[in-house]
């Protein structure tokens, strides 16, 4: 079985409250994009309970057993009699970018195992397992535009489509750790109801649909502001950092030659 975990972007991100459990409440829109990893899952018949994990592409800086893909298998293997699997991940979605690549891989692993072994898990059950792996993992089970709140695990489907826009995504070479990004945040009430995002023309998003992490992260990674300015110069009608960074996306009415503008950075463009 070969599946293709996709990335997401955040459209707007308000950090609204520090919780008593040490986490933060936030409000954001998760939007899936077609930047994808490649995940191959092969059943090892005659053997039980083992996940053999290998990877190519962007190096994964953690032991195989601590990778979220392996953890996804382990969660299901404790409750179901699973054959061992050989799993290969070709990593394309950058880390430290705010794109949810690791969470996507984990969620797609759950969905893939459910199909491979005919476990019969429904969407709600899969989202429950995904929530044990990370706050944004359940989104990748749904994988359509949502308004997310709480820690990001609570979601409401919204009506939003960017299919009429060309998207350019740029990842500076320096990444950002989520804990570091949160350290510079002062929680505040959301200044816009992101559930209404689909009613606001994209041309009016600037200054209204903002990412609170930018004020925390850009002083540490000034390249982010440089990328934003270049995207604007190329004609972007809306530019934002996604998640806690460091990737930045711009929405355009037209195709642009973004690779020439960012020869040293990771660049992805929508079709």
Where are these regions (language model features)?
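DPxDG-like acidic metal-binding loop motif
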Residues: 97-123, 128, 139
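Glycine-rich beta-strand-to-loop/alpha-helix junction loops that act as flexible
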Residues: 101-102, 241-246
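N-terminal pre-core extensions flanking Radical SAM catalytic domains
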Residues: 245-254
